[in-house]
Every structure is written in structure tokens, then in C-alpha cells.
Amino acid sequence: MKLLSKIMIIALAASMLQACNGPGGMNKQGTGTLLGGAGGALLGSQFGKGKGQLVGVGVGALLGAVLGGQIGAGMDEQDRRLAELTSQRALEATPSGTSVEWRNPDNGNHGYVTPNKTYRNSTGQYCREYTQTVVIGGKQQKAYGNACRQPDGLWQVVN
């Protein structure tokens, strides 16, 4: 399960970094494919044991990548900006279990971030587990991750 958690964290980090990329960076469909693949792998890992579980991870990753790519293709720069601002606000000041929503009035895309458990890591930083859900073109995608508060006050996805 640790491997799958790392996959999800890497995918979320790539998604958040995508918001900072210029024209030469990964496109929104690539980001969606990465997120979907990681989410599918996590879901697939819940089925079977041993080799059967590995097959579940592979199939889940493939199906998630296809769906995630389609959803990612529908996210624009404003969607990513709104998602990132909402993530920062939710992680900083929202009680565990309470969702904070974002909505792009121009295209109807929306999502929400739900911070969960708060803890301190081995270096003393405050960290939070969270769930992030986006609905793009009527299709929902959900991801799980951990983020830690940096000295500058911003939250950063960690692995």
C-alpha cells in the first residue's frame, strides 16, 4: 500500500506543478492521464491478492489513465488556478472532514478539497491528509494525498 500512496502523491505533485508550467510544460491532458493512472492503480489494488492484485493495479492504472486523460483535457488554466487556491485555503484553515469547493463560472467545471487528519512529520512540520475531487465535463475524478506546511506558509504535496 505504501507504493500506491507514493504513486498518488507523485500524481498530485505533478498536477500542482502543472499550474506553474509555461507553454513548454506538460499539457492538461498529460496531467489528467497521470492523475487518472495513479487513481486507477489505487482502486485496482483493492482487488485480489498476490499476482491477482498486481493485475488489478495494472488494469486500474490503464483504465484510470484513459479516463483521467479525457478529464484533464477539459481542465483549463483557470480550473487549475482555482483548484490550487482552494487547496491552499482548505489545508491552512479548514477543519478536518469539511469540504471547500471551487467553481469556474466560465465553463462549469468544479471540485472540492477535503482536509482530513492533521499530524506532524519527523521534522516537526504540520501535515495533512486530504481528498481532492474534480468534476470536469460532468466526469468526476478523486485523488488522495498528503501535504505539509512549508516555512513560507504554503502547503506542498509530499511523498
Swiss-Prot record:
Keyword Signal annotated: yes
Name of the protein: 17 kDa surface antigen
Main localization (coarse): membrane
Lipid sites, type N-palmitoyl cysteine: C20
Gene: omp
Signal peptide bounds: 1-19
Keywords recorded for this protein, A-Z: Cell outer membrane, Lipoprotein, Membrane, Palmitate, Signal
GO CC, any one term: cell outer membrane
UniProt family annotation: Belongs to the rickettsiale 17 kDa surface antigen family.
